[in-house]
């Protein structure tokens, strides 16, 4: 009978049972349930005509209803995309790329000669910890938590840049202060490359574009 068959299956030693099942609660829209018939939804064709897919992917990921119901709200979408995805992540990448391209460049990456990672062991440890946390969260299918850890890397990078202020030294003559500041910019460049990989599950299109830039520079380096 069925109960006997089920018991036999359960007793099999070679049968691997699921022990990490991903499940979410409900995602609401502006306080109500999604409904195609009531035209209460986010229509992807219309959305993609005006906006980038990665911004929606980011908001859905950071607002994922993993442990309780969450609400898709357009005002929160605008706020989180502007302040987090653009203001934290995008701003960091833009600052690093802009500053790096202001350096005089012969052949290869102009930041290579400023690689002094031994001077930044504390920052590297912080970044490694964030990556480890993100990996652990992903393995446990806690994607919102993983994304927060990755965004923490961008925050570390922004703090590093702000403290080093490399824009003050780019056009200055070579000195210890200049080398120290530009070593922070060089590390920030590497952090951007790391972010391009870590963010790919959440923002694949912009990550691919960023990876192409870094792949090109690595080939020249």
What residue spans do the PLM features occupy?
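Conserved, charged catalytic cores of large soluble enzymes
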Residues: 93-134, 154, 158-175
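Basic, alpha-helical terminal appendages of large translation-related enzymes
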Residues: 136, 140-142, 151-216, 221
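Catalytic adenosine-cofactor/nucleotide-binding cores of aminoacyl-tRNA synthetases and other
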Residues: 26-116
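Beta-strand segments within the central parallel beta-sheet cores of soluble alpha/beta enzyme folds
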Residues: 19-23
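Single conserved hydrophobic/aromatic residue that forms the stacking wall/gate
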Residues: 1-6, 10, 214-221
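Secondary-structure capping and boundary motifs in well-ordered enzyme cores
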Residues: 36, 47-48, 77-88, 119-127, ...
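Short, charged/polar, low-complexity loop and linker segments
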Residues: 69-74, 129-136
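Short, hydrophobic/amphipathic alpha-helical patches that form generic packing surfaces
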Residues: 11, 57-64, 190-197
